């Protein structure tokens, strides 16, 4: 996905970019509950959760293949009342919202995002009755998404008090989930991403990057998403060698995803390897038809900036 998860640069991130990181990270982590009812649970060796084939297809399209268009098609047929499906729809709506220039379409995407965020929370409230762990996790996601909407529409200064309230609620639900099973792979994947996101991007004493990395290394699954989270974290912690090792592991597990090429390109550029970075930016753009326009624009901007840097050095 975009920004923090899929790669927009961290140091000078705009408030809207930070919000997209939160949306992307939350959705990714939660979308990992995407095992269809008759398929193997990607996190557990026993007691798989019944979620649905269409939701599973959407999850794999986004996070294994980086194919958002196929994901949108699957989500149009997704199982009713499934919180994960609503969270994924929210993520796609946010991507359209941020990438749209037509104001009427932009407003429609904003409204869709708000609606799906609310549906994520409300369906999680129902799930809480039968599956407390996942119910609490999705309640956390719903609150995160609703907080992201507030900041995006009201701005950082006006929206922060309400968004902080949503953030506190989200952590309360995550804590409840952790009481049920502190080593649950879904929980640790989600908390690993969120804690790392907040630790490196937001000046709040809510998260520890060390603990987040430990969660991703020890307990999170599936591994290719854990490696991706580690690559993002090490990138933003200015540890490019470790970031490169992690992204290589992610690519080995999910080689068709153009967003992984994009992230590796960023890491290589930070190491000063502009030539290989440019090649990977271009590789990611060769699959631009399956990516949201906002992500494509980000890649194009970073490619152009890197090309200018190379040209200036050669003068």
What residue ranges belong to the model's regions?
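Short coil/linker segments at helix-helix boundaries
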Residues: 62, 89-133, 138-179, 183, ...
């Amino acid at each position: 996905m975009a920004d923090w998860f899929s790669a927009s640069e961290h140091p000078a991130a705009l408030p809207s970019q930070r919000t997209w990181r939160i949306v992307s990270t939350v959705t990714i982590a939660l979308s990992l509950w995407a095992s269809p009812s008759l398929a193997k649970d990607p996190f557990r060796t026993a007691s798989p959760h019944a979620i649905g084939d269409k939701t599973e297809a959407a999850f794999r399209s986004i996070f294994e293949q980086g194919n958002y268009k196929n994901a949108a098609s699957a989500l149009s047929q997704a199982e009713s009342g499934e919180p994960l499906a609503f969270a994924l729809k929210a993520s796609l709506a946010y991507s359209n919202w941020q990438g749209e220039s037509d104001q009427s379409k932009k407003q429609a995407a904003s409204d869709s995002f708000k609606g799906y965020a609310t549906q994520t929370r409300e369906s999680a409230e129902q799930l809480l009755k039968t599956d407390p762990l996942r119910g609490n996790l999705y309640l956390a996601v719903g609150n995160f998404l609703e907080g992201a909407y507030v900041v995006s529409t009201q701005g950082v200064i006006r929206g922060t008090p309400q968004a902080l309230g949503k953030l506190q609620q989200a952590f309360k639900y995550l804590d409840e989930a952790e009481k049920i099973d502190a080593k649950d792979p879904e929980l640790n994947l989600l908390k690993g991403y969120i804690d790392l996101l907040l630790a490196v991007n937001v000046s709040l004493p809510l998260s520890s990057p060390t603990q987040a990395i430990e969660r991703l290394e020890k307990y999170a699954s599936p591994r290719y998403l854990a490696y991706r989270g580690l690559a993002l974290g090490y990138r933003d912690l200015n540890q490019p060698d470790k970031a490169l090792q992690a992204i290589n592991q992610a690519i080995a597990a999910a080689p068709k995803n153009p967003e992984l090429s994009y992230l590796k390109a960023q890491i290589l550029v930070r190491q000063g390897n502009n030539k290989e970075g440019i090649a990977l930016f271009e590789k990611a753009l060769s699959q631009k038809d399956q990516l949201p326009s906002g992500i494509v624009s980000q890649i194009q901007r970073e490619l152009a900036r890197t090309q200018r840097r190379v040209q200036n050095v050669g003068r």
